[in-house]
Amino acid sequence: VNNCDAPNCRIKYGDNIRALVTYLNVVQCIPFKRIAELISDLCGQKISEGTVQNILKENSTKADAAYEEIRKRIECAPVVGADETGAAVGKELHWNWIFQNDLLTYVYQMKSRGQQAIDSKFPNGLPNSTLVTDRHRSYFNMNVKDHQVCLAHLLRNAEYLNELDTKQDWSRRFIHLIAHAIDLRRAGDITKRKIKVLKTKMKNLLGESLTHLDEEFESFKKGILKVKDYLFTFLTDLHVPYENN
């Protein structure tokens, strides 16, 4: 066995190590410190967190053209789903923003959860798109063709109200209306008359007084009233899904 000292020069990591670092961070969402530990344990190669960061920056730059092309295609897509989720960056809370269609997903991270985070990537909004989202206010400030509220989110909210007060039936009737709309779509049994009946029943339900119930019921109802025009878009445009999952 021959041993020698490492050469006194700048170390350059090979393509395999660089690809592995990028995969572990971008696909597996592993933080810098753990990536450095994994590379050391699996490959016997010491690597610093700073080097991990530099590799990711370099590979990110190489992907800029493709990344921008994805953004442009999302920007002109007829239907787009969007969501945002918190992400710990060091000791700070950042937000991962996701805009996607059936073929492409565009992801970016910002400190802000507000309108400026959206405008930084889509300053003109999505004027050709029906946007499928939760009820986060920033989405409804965007310039879009139309909206569809994610019904999966609403069903979870209503199920919580069921558990909060098992004696009332308001939230159960809300769930029944939403579930019936979904069943119509799945069965392909949609008519203008049935849509009109659904909307009338929802209007009547949202018009009921809930002051005798827990304040969370009234809060939920007020939130639904703000987006009531976007509950059943998926029944008139069959390209639009009823959830953004």
Predicted regions and their residues:
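Catalytic center-proximal scaffold of phosphoryl-transfer enzymes
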Residues: 1-245
